[in-house]
């Protein structure tokens, strides 16, 4: 299998079809990155993520599901060659990310395993529900916050900084490299929730904005009509992407939130009043056609592709 998220086909064939439904939990589904657990009057959300920014990913999943994160649990698998100082570095980084999003580490599991060649970190965020997770409905506008490719380009810069500096000034790197706070969607998600309007939310992450749009439509059972020209990407990110022939639309885009609602312009204005860039990028449509419009051509959105970051890690 390819590195990264497994395909929808594999998920359906080898995961979802084998799962029974037990207890008071939501059923796993495409585009649903957080589980809803209802027990004795408590509405709890749980979301898992892996990787160097796992805390942010897991907490973002809780936010996009209409909740607020309260704490995280972590699992750390260390290879036999790693020294104790490496474990300390991992814990310090997890704690630093927790400080950024305002949650604590409630517990976890740490083990040394001979079957890995580098540390593996998995995070599960646990939170409470602020509203019911909704599906998108035909006729709604699609609003996107911030810019695509922010988290992915951080990875590229981390691995290719010297090569980038051979062709581009350091100022380009500085402007392309997103601050940690830019990768968090909790603020805009809670602003959207407070409007008390019908609409879906989905955070972009691995697979980029194209994967996020596909997942949202697949979960909702709808089509899409997207204007590519309205999807915001920083010029500095474009310049770095061009150096390595990267497609920014399938590049990890953590920090970007998709929302659907009847009047997208109203949400855009509210976001901008709160210091968050946003734009209407298209509409939810009936049927299964998922169309991307560009200046030169129209195309159908296909199944999510492997994220471009796997060319660099």
In which residue ranges do the predicted regions lie?
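Beta-strand->loop->alpha-helix junctions that form or flank phosphate-binding loops
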Residues: 26-29, 204-205, 223-232, 250-252, ...
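Solvent-exposed alpha-helices and their adjacent loops that cap or buttress functional pockets
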Residues: 27-29, 37-39, 98, 113-118, ...
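Active-site-proximal betaalpha loop/short-helix elements
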Residues: 79-81, 177-253
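Phosphate/diphosphate-binding glycine-rich loops and adjacent basic-rich segments that engage nucleotide
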Residues: 130-180
């Amino acid at each position: 299998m390819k590195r990264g998220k497994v395909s929808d086909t594999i998920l359906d064939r080898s995961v979802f079809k084998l799962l029974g439904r037990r207890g008071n939990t939501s059923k796993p589904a495409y585009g649903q990155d957080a589980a809803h657990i209802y027990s004795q009057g408590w509405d709890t959300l749980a979301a898992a993520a892996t990787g160097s920014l796992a805390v942010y990913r897991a907490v973002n999943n809780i936010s996009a599901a209409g909740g607020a994160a309260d704490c995280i649990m972590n699992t750390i698998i260390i290879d036999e060659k790693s020294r104790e100082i490496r474990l300390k570095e991992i814990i310090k980084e997890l704690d630093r990310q927790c400080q950024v999003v305002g949650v604590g580490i409630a517990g976890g599991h740490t083990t040394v395993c001979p079957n890995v060649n580098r540390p593996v970190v998995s995070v599960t965020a646990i939170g409470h529900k602020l509203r019911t997770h909704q599906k998108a409905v035909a006729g709604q506008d699609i609003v996107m916050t911030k810019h695509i490719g922010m988290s992915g380009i951080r990875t590229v810069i981390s691995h290719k900084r010297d090569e980038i500096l051979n062709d581009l000034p350091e100022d380009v790197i500085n402007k392309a490299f997103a601050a940690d706070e830019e990768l968090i969607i909790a603020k805009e998600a809670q602003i959207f929730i407070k409007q008390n309007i019908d609409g879906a939310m989905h955070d972009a992450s691995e697979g980029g904005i194209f994967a996020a749009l596909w997942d949202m439509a697949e979960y909702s059972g709808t089509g899409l009509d997207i204007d590519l020209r309205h999807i915001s990407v920083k010029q500095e990110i474009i310049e770095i992407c061009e150096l390595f022939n990267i497609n920014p639309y399938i590049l990890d885009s953590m920090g970007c939130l998709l929302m659907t609602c009847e009047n997208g312009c109203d949400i855009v204005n509210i976001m901008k009043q709160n210091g968050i860039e946003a734009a209407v990028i298209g509409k939810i449509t009936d049927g299964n056609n998922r169309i991307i419009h560009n200046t030169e051509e129209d195309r159908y959105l296909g199944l999510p592709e492997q994220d471009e970051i796997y060319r660099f890690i």
